[in-house]
Amino acid sequence: MKNVLLFNDISGLGNCSLGANLPILAKLGHNCIPVVTGAFSCQTGFVHFTVSRNDNLTKCVADILANRTADALYVGFCMDSALLAEVCSVLNASRDRFVFVDPIMGDNGSLYSIFDAQYVENMKQAVKGADCISPNLTEACLLAGVDYRELLSHKGEPTFLAICGKTFENFLTTTGAKSAVITGVECGSYVGNIVLDGGAVRYVTNERVPVNYSGTGDVFSSVLLGELLLGKSTYDATLLAANFVCKAAQNTECQDRRFGVEFCKMLNLLD
C-alpha cells in the first residue's frame, strides 16, 4: 500500500476529479490523502456551478506531511497559476517520491478559458522530472509547442495515431518527464493512447464509445497511477487503464455526458 498525496478538485456532480481518484486508488489498495484545490457544486460542463478555491493549500500540505509521509504525489486540476505554483513548490521538495502529473489545462485544441499562458509555463515546470504524465492531445501540444491544428489536419488519415506518435517521439526529452501516456487520441471508430517510455513509442487502442463522458481522463489517470504503484510497466498499466475506461463507458446508462462515466459498478474489474 502506498500513501498518495492527491492535488485535485472535487465536484458534487460529474463523477470526476477526486470523485474518481479516491475510489479507484482505494480499490487498488492505496491510501489516499486528498488536498482539495477547489470545490465545485457541479463540474464545469454544467451551465451553472459554484466554486470555492483552496486559499490555504500550503498550510494544508504542511499539516498533512507533519503527520504522514507521502510515497507518491498526484497532480490534477489546480484552479490557477498561483495555486499550481504552490503545488510545484511541494513537488520540488518531493522529487525523491513517485510523481504523477495529469496536466489538466485544455481540450479540443484550446487552453481552458480559466487558464492563462502562465499556467502553461507552470505546468511545464510541474511535469519536468515527473515519473509519469498523462496529457491529452491538446495538453501534449501545449507542453511541447506542437501546432495542434496542423497535427489535426491528418486526422482523417488511417495512420493518424502513428503520425501523432512520430510527432511526439521526442516528447520526454522536450518535457523532462520520465514516461508519458498521451491519452484519448480519437481515430475514427477507435481511441488510441500513445505510450512513451524508455525510448520506445507504443500504442494501446480500444473501441470508441459514442458519448464523450466527463471525467474519463480522471478515471484513466487513477487506474494508471494505481497500477504503476503496484509495479506494473507503463505499457501494462496503460492497457489496464484503457480497458477499464472502455468497459465503464460501455456500461454507463446515463447518456448525458455531464454526469460522467458510471465507473463505480465496474470496480470489480480492478481485483
Give names to the regions the model predicted.
Residues K2-V101, M105-S113, L267-L270:
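Conserved N-terminal subdomain of the carbohydrate kinase-like
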Residues S11, G38-F40, M79, M105-D107, ...:
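Glycine-rich beta-alpha junction loops
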Residues G12-L13, V201-G215:
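Short pre-catalytic strand/loop immediately N-terminal to key active-site residues, enriched for Gly-Thr
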Residues I114-V201:
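Conserved phosphate/ATP/ADP-binding segment of small-molecule kinases
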Residues L142, V211-L240:
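Short, small-residue alpha-helix embedded
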Residues Y235-D271:
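Charged C-terminal helix
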